């Protein structure tokens, strides 16, 4: 799999590329990454990538032309590898990112992560070049880099070979439409709180049953919307 990020702040992606599971997966060749700075696709001496919005208002907007040129360069390089790009833009107006969508996107051969800044991007560029808009939630961030990092991390951990224990991804929250169950490690008693006895029983069927019940309990208490959705999907 290949990720290409169109971003003014490529160094932010070091958080994924240099640490943990995503670093090991990169070292194992499970995915590739390349960043593209829109400033490299400008003509003026100041490498301008933003301007004032028509109609007035606060802040600046990213210009369409440098982003369009950057995306053309990405597309050309991907075409040389017979890869078709899927361009994702991160925006509060996008559809909320879910584990189901992560699982679908991980099968894409090439994702282009378009990271906006300032007050956003000229709408004409979005209409012409973007395949999908994604949101992490109903809040505003300073740019698209953090959502892009979150998406990369979520996808990479699902790639075969990324996790040392293949069952870890299958047990993640949302993988079965529910929150994950509670987990415990040593010592058996910590500050007067003991590990549930069933987890020490060695009875795998009982442990699996307990974990499923706990997932249902937590989901019902903390995210009843997920439980309703899972029940609806099961009926259909």
UniProtKB/Swiss-Prot annotation:
Any single Gene Ontology cellular-component annotation: cytosol
Keyword match GTP-binding: no
GO annotation, biological process: tRNA N1-guanine methylation
Keywords (A to Z) from UniProt: Cytoplasm, Methyltransferase, S-adenosyl-L-methionine, Transferase, tRNA processing
Subcellular compartments: Cytoplasm
Enzyme Commission identifier(s): 2.1.1.228
Subunit and partners: Homodimer.
Protein name as it appears in the record: tRNA (guanine-N(1)-)-methyltransferase
Biological source species: Thiobacillus denitrificans (strain ATCC 25259 / T1)
Lineage: Bacteria, Pseudomonadati, Pseudomonadota, Betaproteobacteria, Nitrosomonadales
Gene: trmD
